[in-house]
Amino acid sequence: MNVIEGNLVGTGLKIGIVVSRFNEFITSKLLSGAIDGLTRHGVSDNDITVTWVPGAFEIPLVAKKMAESKQFDAIITLGAVIRGATSHFDYVCSEAAKGVSHAALTSGVPVIFGVLTTDTIEQAIERAGTKAGNKGWEAAVSAIEMANVLRGLA
């Protein structure tokens, strides 16, 4: 029996990060967590490319372009969508998630969904480096593992 598993060795991996400027007080913390997670696992600063976009809705297009460029072993998407009084939250969350998934499936490159979708600002803060850890860091570790899984399948 063959078992293919990813590992958490980031040495030599090239990682793209797409991060939303909207709710930057949260997304900047997610970005710091992601970069910390990548570098602690051996990814060189020179092998990390960060691209800022206006909001979560714009993330999928840039993630897809980066993935299709074949310059990256994985793409991490980071954003923070916080529920408001209208249904706008539902549309943005749904389309961001669908778009990120589509980018991965059409490009064959892992595109990791690190977009927070929370009901409150407090929940977002908790997931950006306090009580609930840093979801940017978790997305970075997932990106490394998935890049290595795909290398194992090649």
From Swiss-Prot:
It comes from the Bacteria. 5-amino-6-(D-ribitylamino)uracil binds at F22, A56, F57, E58, A80, V81, I82, F113. One of its GO terms (cellular component) is riboflavin synthase complex. The keyword Transferase applies. The keyword Electron transport does not apply. One of its GO terms (biological process) is riboflavin biosynthetic process. It catalyses: (2S)-2-hydroxy-3-oxobutyl phosphate + 5-amino-6-(D-ribitylamino)uracil = 6,7-dimethyl-8-(1-D-ribityl)lumazine + phosphate + 2 H2O + H(+). (2S)-2-hydroxy-3-oxobutyl phosphate binds at A85, T86, R127. The active site is at H88 (proton donor). Signal peptide: none annotated. PANTHER family: 6,7-DIMETHYL-8-RIBITYLLUMAZINE SYNTHASE (PTHR21058:SF0), 6,7-DIMETHYL-8-RIBITYLLUMAZINE SYNTHASE DMRL SYNTHASE LUMAZINE SYNTHASE (PTHR21058). HAMAP family: Lumazine_synth. Belongs to the DMRL synthase family. This is 6,7-dimethyl-8-ribityllumazine synthase.
